[in-house]
Design a protein with these regions (language model features):
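Inter-heme linker and motif-flanking segments adjacent to c-type heme-binding CXXCH motifs
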Residues: 60-61, 115-129, 149-159, 176-183, ...
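N-terminal signal peptide c-region/cleavage motif recognized by signal peptidases
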Residues: 35-37
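Short, Lys/Arg-enriched N-terminal segments with co-localized hydrophobic residues
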Residues: 2-15
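Sequence/structural segment immediately N-terminal to covalent heme-attachment motifs in c-type
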Residues: 40-58, 126-149, 164, 218
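Extracytoplasmic/secreted proteins, especially bacterial periplasmic and envelope-associated proteins
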Residues: 50, 76, 93-96, 108, ...
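C-terminal capping alpha-helices of c-type cytochrome domains
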Residues: 99-122, 166, 191-218
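Gly/Gly-Pro-rich "capping" loops immediately C-terminal to redox-active cysteine motifs
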Residues: 44, 59-89, 95-100, 139, ...
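Bacterial N-terminal signal peptides that target proteins for export
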Residues: 14-26
C-alpha cells in the first residue's frame, strides 16, 4: 500500500513532530518541565523555555504555521491553553504539552508571554488591491467588532495584526471546515467567507504593522 504524499508543509510538521517524539514523548517532556515538584523553585520564565522550541527564543516562531505568542493578549492565551488542556482545541504538539502544564501555571504563562514585545516577522504589506479586498471582507464579516480597529484584539480576543501568514490562513480555513471547533461563532463567520477572501485577509493581516498606532497614547 503506497503511503500518501505529504505536502511541503505537512512534511515539515511531521519532521518536527518526529524530532520531538524521538527526544522524548511530548507528555513526558511536559510532565518533566511543568511539574510543580520538579520545578517548584523555578520562575515561570524558566518553565517557558520549552515554548521557544517552536515559538522562538525571541518570539519569532521557528515555522511559518506556528503562531506568535509574544505580546498576544493575556485572556486569549489563557482560554487557548485551557482549551488545549480540555481537548476543546486539538493539536498534535500542543495538546500533550498543555496537558502537562500545572493548572496553577496556566494564568502565569499567559501573563508572562502577554508582557513580551510582539516581534516583527518582516512580512510584506499586502498589495493595494489585496488590502482593499481584505478591508471590504473584514467590514462585511464584522472583524473589527471583536478584533478592534487595528486588529490588535483585546482581552480574550486574539491579536491578528502581524501574525504569521501561514498560521492565519490555516486557522481561518480550520474554522471554516470546523477542523478547529473551539469557537463556533468564528466557524459560522468563516463558513460565510469565500476561500479567496480568506486568502486576502491572511495576506493583509500578516503584513499589518500597528505598533506605531498602539504606542501613540503612551
Amino acid at each position: 500500500m503506497q503511503c500518501p504524499v505529504l505536502s511541503t508543509t505537512e512534511a515539515r510538521d511531521e519532521a518536527m513532530l518526529r524530532s520531538i517524539r524521538l527526544t522524548a514523548p511530548a507528555a513526558v517532556v511536559a510532565g518533566l518541565l511543568f511539574s510543580t515538584t520538579a520545578l517548584a523553585d523555578d520562575p515561570i520564565a524558566e518553565k517557558a523555555k520549552l515554548c521557544a522550541t517552536c515559538h522562538g527564543e525571541q518570539g519569532v516562531p521557528t515555522q511559518k504555521n506556528i503562531p506568535v505568542i509574544w505580546g498576544q493578549n493575556e485572556g486569549y492565551l489563557i482560554f487557548q491553553l485551557r482549551d488545549f488542556k480540555s481537548g476543546a482545541r486539538k493539536n498534535d504538539l500542543m495538546s500533550p504539552i498543555a496537558a502537562g502544564i500545572d493548572p496553577n501555571d496556566v494564568n502565569a504563562f499567559a501573563a508572562y508571554f502577554s508582557k513580551l514585545k510582539w516581534p516583527n516577522l518582516q512580512q510584506a504589506p499586502a498589495p493595494a488591491d489585496v488590502a482593499a479586498k481584505a478591508q471590504a471582507t473584514a467590514a462585511s464579516v464584522g472583524c473589527p467588532g471583536c478584533h478592534l480597529a487595528y486588529f490588535q484584539g483585546d482581552g480574550t480576543t486574539a491579536r491578528l495584526a502581524g501574525q504569521n501568514h501561514d498560521y492565519l490562513l490555516k486557522t481561518m480555513n480550520d474554522f471554516r471546515d470546523k477542523t478547529r471547533g473551539n469557537n463556533p461563532g468564528m466557524s459560522d463567520l468563516m463558513k460565510a467567507t469565500s476561500p479567496e477572501d480568506i486568502g486576502a485577509l491572511a495576506q493583509y493581516l500578516a503584513g499589518l504593522q500597528i505598533d506605531q498606532y498602539l504606542n501613540q497614547g503612551n
